[in-house]
Amino acid sequence: MSKSKLDLDFFKKEVFMAPKTVAIIMDGNGRWAKQRGLPRTAGHKKGADTIRTVALAAQDMGIQKLILYAFSTENWKRPEDEVSYLCKLPGLFFNKFINELMEKNIRVTFAGELEKFPQATQDVINKAVNMSKNNTGLELCLAINYGSRREMLLGMKKYADEVVQGKRENDLTEEEFSKYLFVPEDIDLMIRTSGELRISNYLL
């Protein structure tokens, strides 16, 4: 087997218990491109295409939910041309791979504030979500325009509004608060593809 392919033999053994929820920080794409004398956008495209490989491998391993940190709230500070390309990537990815994801019974969801993206990108993502909503395999969740501090702030505001409006009592617990988050589940395994040891405002 070539090094470019994932060897899943170990994960198929009975002794391996797959984590239920895995989160991946997709970074290092720009550095990958620079090392090869390519524009940063080439690195981002390579990273997006890799989503397919990772999602199919996660499905084979028995992972229930895969959350990919694809676009953070801090990414808006990058150069305008790079941001423009990053905003187009979800559309390029789903137009290329949505049929295969459907065949593999993979369900697409997203975490974050989609409204800031161009309408065309929103439409493609929402189409993928709606097309796959009845699938029962791996949940592939894209964290886009996502930041954990922002997630908690929005959750607290929503909870406070409901208390003020008399929709609920002021009796918040950790378990209840998780329902106000984009990602309510506990993360069993987090991976940062560049190897750096920081979480960059992701799923705090």
Predicted features by range, described:
Residues 1-204:
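Flexible, compositionally biased loop and terminal segments
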